Amino acid sequence: MKVREVIAFKDYFEKFLLEQPNKVQDKIFKIIEAIETLERVPSNYLKFLVGTDGLYESRIQLGSNIWRVFCFFDNDKLVILLNGFQKKTQKTPKTEIEKGLRLMAEYYEQKNKKNEN
């Protein structure tokens, strides 16, 4: 049973997903399913990025390769998927975090415009 809904904002996540090998896509779908169905999502699947005002990273690992998908909670029951990337350094690149924050701000701008009409 779903405890929350996961949706993608625009096509950033879909483009990222389609570029990945099938095994990585399968792992991403398993993590999305965990986010949708588990009341408490393990931190090895979903981790809050400190200092980002609400941005999370979903963590995918296959062998020695690591990927991240940024997302955030619009409310307790709605998770918005943003962009993804293959992680090649120990720390998450600042440019990727900034892109995620930009997309999150864009989401809220669009949502607020819809609510005004």
Where are these regions (language model features)?
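Basic, Lys/Arg-enriched alpha-helical interface segments
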Residues: 1-66, 75-78, 88-117
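Conserved catalytic cores of phosphodiester-cleaving nucleases, focusing on short active-site segments
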Residues: 81-82
